[in-house]
Each structure stands twice: as C-alpha cells, then as structure tokens.
Amino acid sequence: MARLLMKNASHIVTCDPSDTVYTDSNLLMEDGVITYIGPEEQQTEEVIDATGCIVYPGLINTHHHLYQTFSRNLPQVQNLELFDWLKALYEIWKNLDSQVIYHSSVTGMGELMKNGWTTCFDHHYVFPQGQAEGLLDAQFAAAEDLGIRMYASRGSMDLSKKDGGLPPDSVVQTVDEILRDCQRAVETYHDPSRFSMRMVALAPCSPFSVSEELLRQSAILARDLGVRLHTHLCETKDEERFVRERCGMRPLEYMESLGWIGPDVWYAHGIHFNGEELRRLAETGTGVAHCPISNMKLSSGVCRVPEMLELGVPVGLAVDGSASNDGSNLLEELRVAYLLHRLQSSEKAPSGYDVLKIATVGSAKILGRDDIGSLEVGKAGDLFAIDTRRLELVGADLDPKSLLGTVGWKGPVDYTVVNGKVTVRSGKLVNLDEEKAAREAAALVRDYLSR
C-alpha cells in the first residue's frame, strides 16, 4: 500500500461543506485516497514535513486549449477581439500535429501543476486536414508522463467559412468523421470510475463553427455514451449577433433547442446571458467555466458571477487557452477573479474564499465529479501546499481561506500532490526534466510558427 503523510501543516483548508480549517494537523493518504486528517501522529515511510505550510485542495481547471501554449504573446493578435483574433490564429493552428500537441500539453500542464493544479479539462477542437490522427492520444500521453489527472475532450468544427462559419476549410471535418472519432476517444480513454485519471467529454467548438446537425448529434451521442457536453457560449456580442441572424434565436435558446442544457452540460465564458437565462441555467443545473483573464484580454466582457452564485448556477474557474491568457496559472486566475468582481460588484462580489471554492468544489461539480475538489476522508489525495515562512507572505496566514484571492500567490507552490503522489516538490516538477523540456519546446515553437 502506497502511503504519503503531510505532517504538521500549519493550516489545512478543506473546502468541505462545513468550511473546516485544521490547524497544526496531519493529512494521510493511502493508495491515493485521504484516510485521515487531524492532530494525531501517523506512521508511514513517505513523509512531507509541512511545518509552516498551508495545504489546499488541488485546483481544478475547467476550460483550456493546451495547443495554444505555442501561439501565445504573438504581436499580430494582441489587440484583436475574438472573431478577428480567431481568423488570424487559424492560419497558424492549421499546422498543428501530434508532436506540437504533445509538447504544448507538457508545457501548459507543467505550468499548471507548478501552480497547484491537479485536474485539467482541455477543449481541443482543431483537427487539421492530414494531421487529425493521434492528437487526443498525444494529450493523454503528456498527462501520463507528468502524473496529472486529465479530463480531455473530443472537440470539433464542421462549419467552415464557405458554409457561413468562421474557420477555414483546412481545420474542419465532416459530421461522420467527427462522430466516429468521438466514439473512439470515449471507448479508448474514458474511465468513469471513482478517482479516474482519464475522462473524456464531447465538445463541439461553438455555434459559429459547428452546424446544427453536429450539435444535435453530439448531444445524443454523449448521452448514449454517458459522457458530458461542453462548448463555448455567450462569450461575445459578435457571437450573439451571429446566432440571432443565422438561427433567429438567442444563443442559449438555440442550444437548448438542440438538447444542450442540463447538469451534464457546461459552457465556457457565459458572459452575455440575460437574467432569465441565468435563472434557466440554475433551474437545469447547467454550468459555466469562468475565464476572467481571457475575457479581459479579448475585451469580451465580465461574467455575471455574483448573480450566478446567488441563483445557484454551478460555476468553475478556468484559464482558457494560452493564446488568450497568455499563460496557464490558475492561482493567478483565482486572484484576478476576486479583484475583478470586487471592482464590478463591490459587496456583492465573491470573497477570496468563495473564489477558492469556485476553483475547487465548484469546478469539480461542473465536471461531474464528487471524488475531487475538497480535502475529506474518502476523497482523492489531490492537494498543494505553500510554505508561508517567506517574506512575501508575512501576516498573510491570518485568514488562510481567503489568502489566495486577497493576497495572492503566483507560485510556484512548494508541493503538488496528485492521486497521493508528489508531482511537484520544492517548486519543481518531479516527473520532468524542466530545462530539457523547455529547450525542446522552444525549438519546436520556432519550427511550428515558421511553417
């Protein structure tokens, strides 16, 4: 039996239903599962001395585009809004292949892990003609090499520019091709068991790049296969105009008409829902992945998170792709979310601790998982720890629950543990030679961008 003990943590912030915070306590994991939290001494061979540390549940990222890690900070797109931004970047993304996917995934997930992330959902929807094979497989290989909990998606686009959509022909597929590979991906990789390290959702890209038929058939197939549904929705006013002009409906009304609503569905962004639509999301348990930094960079708007939380809409936190973020740091996202809503909503804004819960138990809920997101006996041993005995955090531990929102910590964290195994130690990835990986990735970026 593999056992790991976090010993003598100054605080353990559990994010459990009672908002419990343990002080001067130990946390024991056995075969990847938490079996004890409390002050009593525990004996085991592998021990992390957590003296001075605050231990938190592992952060859960609910929307990403890992392939975009190799197209960040490009000067030609820095001042564009979504539609023009996408049109410019499709000309780069059409050159994706499995090698780029693997190394960009290692780079992006490695950054996330160094900053306390333990579960990542990735929305991969670009499958270039002639290079579509093996892309999702490369992501799972990268996740396995890093030792991370991976929730991938088989994304898709079939509505090209010639058919009235946004993407060029070079990055779209037929409905039949897409549905066949969706089924293959689920049958090959989706593990629905408790503490699963590999899961798959179906995730057509957006209403402006996917046909009505593909959206409808994807919803039917996902429910036949018992997997979840995800897409972008209500991200910009341009999208709203597109759907109104093409379909005669608002975006949520259109998606609901195709079966895209319910507790097995979550949308990325969700900025431009009206009040009635927010109530509909709450009634149906439909979730939203909040991506504040991306929304700010692309001038998309501010998601109505305070109202969502008040109504009971499930909300998770996400970094979005590195071409619109331009990074993979969920700790930074957490603090930005806190500050953005303080600016926008004052006393109605979520507290620093509320935002931590959005990034943990909230994110777990919209991914349909009750085995991760909080530190409780019987849940997965996914956590991270920050040593507060440093100049930057003097006095910050007076409110450990809110620290990550109010004071903030950009990382790297001192420890990240996934499934009861240490994946980051003293701020360094355990399963990766970071310097070598960075050199290889940098060389590949230059090659990829010159294609």
Region spans (language model):
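Acidic, glycine-enriched loop/beta-strand segments at the rims
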Residues: 12-24, 37, 298-299, 305, ...
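Metal-coordinating catalytic core of metallo-dependent amide/deamination hydrolases
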Residues: 130-270
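N-terminal metal-binding scaffold of metallo-dependent hydrolase/deaminase domains
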Residues: 1-43, 53-54
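Active-site gating loops and adjacent loop-to-helix segments of metal-dependent hydrolytic enzymes
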Residues: 70-101, 159-175, 196, 237-264, ...
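C-terminal cap of metal-dependent C-N hydrolases
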Residues: 15, 380-438
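Alpha-helical scaffold segments that flank or form the walls of functional sites
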Residues: 28, 72-149, 180-194, 442-450
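His/Asp/Glu-enriched, well-ordered alpha-helical/loop segment
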Residues: 257-264, 306-390, 406-408
